[in-house]
Structures are given as C-alpha cells and as structure tokens.
Design a protein with these regions (language model features):
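First exposed extracellular module after export/assembly in secreted or surface-exposed proteins
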Residues: 1-113
Length: 113
C-alpha cells in the first residue's frame, strides 16, 4: 500500500505552486484516477480535502497494489469546473472518480512498476 499526495507545479516565466489555489477553490476542481494494465485499487484518503458537496477532491490517495508483478500505467486528470462529480464511480477500467462537464487542466499518465 502506498499513500500519494499530489502537488501541482506550473512552470512558465516563474515557478508557481498551484496546489494551494486548487485547495482554496476545491469546489471548482476534481481529480480522477484510471489505472491501465495494472492491478491497483485507488482509494481517496481519509484525510483528503472534502468539497462542500461531500466529495473528496483527490489530492491525497491510497494505492493498493494487488500483484507484485504489476506493470502498467496510471492516468490522473485534474478537472476544472465540472458540473457534477462522483468520487465513488468505479468502471470496468477501475477508474476512480467521474465528472460531467468541465475542462481538463491536467492529464498525465505515469508508469507504475
């Protein structure tokens, strides 16, 4: 089991940490996780930031790896101004979190070993 905490750094003219802004504007953001070809279960951490609608933002999570031979990918998206969110949405691809509407601010895929 691994505990993950996301930190959003923006680099352009100056280095800028946007994590605080995301926390302050928690109701305007939501994070989804989608493992691919990896036997991983992602849970939103008990100490994660909670939006006013009762949904956890996703900045803090717990990753349970079910196989020692797990090699795959994890896709993480930060959605800005979604019209609705569901933190408990599981799908056939083991995605955690679902949104309707909004814009994708961040869309990254990382290797999982």
């Amino acid at each position: 089991t691994y505990f993950a905490e996301l930190d959003f750094q923006i680099k352009h003219d100056d280095h800028y940490d946007s994590t605080d802004e995301i926390m302050e504007e928690k109701d305007q953001h939501f994070i989804t996780f989608a493992p691919a070809n990896a036997d991983i279960v992602v849970l939103r951490a008990a100490n994660d930031i909670v939006r006013t609608d009762g949904q956890k933002l996703g900045l803090k999570s717990e990753w349970k790896i079910n196989s020692t031979q797990t090699t795959g990918k994890m896709n993480v998206k930060l959605i800005h101004t979604p019209t609705s969110v569901n933190q408990n949405y599981p799908s056939a691809t083991n995605q955690l979190g679902q949104t309707q509407g909004g814009e994708t601010d961040v869309d990254i895929t990382v290797d999982v070993h």
